[in-house]
Amino acid sequence: MKLYYEKRGQGDPIVFVHGNGEDHHTFDTTVEVLEADHTCYAVDSRGHGESPSVEELHYEDMADDMVEFLETHDLNNITFFGFSDGAIVGLLTAMKTDRIGRLVICGANTEPRGIKGWAYRMFRGAYFLTHDPKMKVMLREPHITEEQLKQITIPTLVLAGDRDMIRERETKKIAAALPNSTLRILEEATHISYGQNSTRAAIEYIAWVQDLENR
């Protein structure tokens, strides 16, 4: 599938993938921070933004789209920067290609019940009213095992907020299973506040990369 994207900056490539119901503008502020030293590709996932609409959404299909995107644009050794659903797609994409050199996952879950109960009930109610495929995929997917996570050996920054809608034990489980991960639980941060149009994740990313380079 041909995905819409916007490209800004120059330097090491970063591919940004947004969350559910969003589009590439989720990362406008993040890109502003990073574009001086990076070529930033902000992508609209299938069924979102200006990319083609679909009747059904599945995270595996979205990951396949990203593999195709990297191959089409001949991108190698990229940083994959995913928020929420985009973080799920990042994990799955990293299992499918060796074109990713570093991974940043913000607010990821490996199973639907990794979402806190109040949020899950809210999404279930929204799906009951709208039958929106974007709601449906959150209620039924993903199903990523710890064994699968152990296959991802690239450096990975795992971010979440201390007030995130993702259960903290879920975030810690993901970080523990990834062999080469760094975990950051951000104080006074909700699921949205550090991920959408925020400098916070960008600052955490810069500090993490500097730490990797100094090891």
Q: Language-model features: where?
A:
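Conserved HGGG/HGGXW glycine-rich cap/lid loop of the alpha/beta-hydrolase fold
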Residues: 6-50
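Active-site nucleophile elbow and catalytic-triad environment of alpha/beta-hydrolase enzymes
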Residues: 133-148
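Conserved alpha/beta-hydrolase "acid-adjacent" motif
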Residues: 165-170
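Catalytic active-site module of serine/aspartate enzymes centered on a nucleophile-bearing elbow/loop
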Residues: 187-215
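Flexible "cap/lid" loop of the alpha/beta hydrolase fold
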Residues: 88-95, 103-131
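Alpha/beta-hydrolase fold catalytic core
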Residues: 1-14, 37, 206, 210-215
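Short beta-strand/loop motif that positions the catalytic acidic residue
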Residues: 151-152, 158-160
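Active-site loop/oxyanion-hole signature of alpha/beta-hydrolase fold enzymes
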Residues: 41, 45-79, 203
